[in-house]
């Protein structure tokens, strides 16, 4: 499995990123709302709710403002669309709510959904409320605080949960219309091309080459499943003491599509992310890419994974498009976090990495 040269550097160190994204903060002025109106809505729509209500804003969450709702008996989480000018396909909190509402009864680890509000008059934008799941958020993929056996167990637990998602019968859950089966990769390339162009701040030759090459070289979609589309350790809650996923978070990008797009996005950590920088994965306790691929194939009944370099090129291109969208929101004044501006430097690095993978895939 070939790898591109030179890992793409993170915008900040993992410890800094954890500090920036862990815990709550005072509600940003641009994200304040009528808390009394929210409490009234909760009383009418959330079973078992009893005030008084205290609202705090979580740090991080650059896409959709996320709040901790504290009551004497129970804590909740609210996610809402940000105010201001928005890209048409972004911030789909209603889709998040729909998918966790479908998954929760099956036993798949998601937070219990309590209610969706599409009435902008309550807090200013659409929002939903779910339970607050307690446990560990693991920001550093290398898991420096853990012994090698637990590192291995945590990564394999995350992998099993992803395989469980891809093995789920979405039709039986009422999600047949959640996305369009077939041509997923082509549609995703088109989506992220449009987002990149809508938010473009500087011309990048590598992105232009990818925009031309990727649609012409798409592998055949061989399966349609639920895809999370942003699956990584820091988008899940791990049990407080066990190597077990208790909730997968941030379903904004979820749709029906090719599960290999999901899985190879996870694999990017092995080729140009934190895990790629570890010299001896086995000694560290983290599965090698070969082990991870073999186990995913075993869990999902595959004989192998073709054209990995094409998927790596696509995933780096896609991430460049996502980050360029954040850059655009900073420019337009709708970004949730001042740290979002730092992402701009990553876009050309990702574009160059994507083109290296594309060349290894035959471009």
Identify the residue ranges that each predicted region occupies:
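Juxta-kinase regulatory segment immediately upstream of eukaryotic protein kinase catalytic domains
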Residues: 13-49
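ATP-binding pocket architecture of kinase catalytic cores
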Residues: 52-226, 240-242
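All-alpha amphipathic helical-bundle segments outside canonical DNA-binding/catalytic cores
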Residues: 179-180, 303-315
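Catalytic-loop of the protein kinase fold
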Residues: 226-228, 233
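Hydrophobic residue at the +6 position relative to the catalytic HRD Asp in the kinase catalytic loop
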Residues: 236-238
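Activation of the activation-loop gatekeeper triad in protein kinase-fold domains
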Residues: 249-254
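Active-site activation/catalytic loop segments of kinase-like enzymes and analogous catalytic loops
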Residues: 261-300, 315-332
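Helical subdomain adjoining the active site within ATP-dependent kinase catalytic cores
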Residues: 304, 309, 321-363
């Amino acid at each position: 499995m070939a790898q591109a040269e030179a890992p793409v550097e993170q915008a900040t160190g993992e410890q800094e990123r954890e500090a920036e994204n862990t815990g709550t903060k005072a509600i940003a002025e641009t994200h304040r709302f009528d808390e009394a109106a929210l409490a009234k809505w909760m009383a009418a729509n959330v079973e078992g709710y009893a005030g008084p209500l205290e609202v705090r804003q979580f740090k991080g969450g650059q896409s959709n403002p996320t709040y901790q709702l504290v009551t004497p008996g129970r804590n909740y989480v609210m996610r809402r669309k940000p105010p201001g000018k928005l890209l048409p396909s972004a911030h789909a909190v209603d889709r998040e709510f729909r998918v966790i509402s479908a998954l929760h009864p099956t036993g798949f680890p998601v937070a219990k959904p309590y209610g969706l509000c599409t009435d902008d008059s309550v807090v200013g934008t659409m929002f939903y409320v779910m339970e607050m799941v307690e446990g560990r958020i693991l920001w550093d993929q290398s898991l420096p605080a853990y012994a090698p056996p637990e590192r291995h167990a945590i990564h394999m637990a995350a992998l099993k949960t992803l395989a469980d998602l891809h093995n789920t019968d979405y039709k039986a859950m009422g999600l047949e219309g959640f996305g369009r089966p077939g041509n997923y990769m082509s549609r995703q390339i088109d989506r992220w091309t449009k987002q990149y162009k809508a938010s473009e701040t500087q011309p990048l030759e590598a992105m232009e080459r990818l925009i031309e090459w990727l649609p012409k070289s798409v592998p055949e979609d061989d399966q349609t499943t639920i895809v999370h589309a942003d699956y990584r350790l820091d988008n899940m809650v791990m049990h407080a003491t066990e190597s077990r996923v208790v909730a997968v978070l941030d379903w904004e990008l979820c749709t029906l599509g090719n599960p290999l797009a999901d899985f190879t996005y996870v694999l990017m950590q092995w080729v140009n992310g934190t895990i790629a920088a570890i010299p001896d994965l086995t000694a560290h306790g983290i599965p090698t890419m070969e082990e991870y691929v073999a186990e995913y194939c075993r869990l999902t009944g595959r004989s192998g994974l073709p054209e990995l370099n094409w998927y790596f090129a696509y995933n780096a291109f896609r991430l460049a498009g996502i980050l360029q969208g954040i850059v655009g929101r900073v420019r337009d004044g709708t970004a949730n976090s001042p740290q979002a501006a730092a992402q701009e430097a990553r876009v050309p690095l990702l574009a160059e990495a994507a083109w290296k993978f594309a060349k290894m895939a035959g471009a």
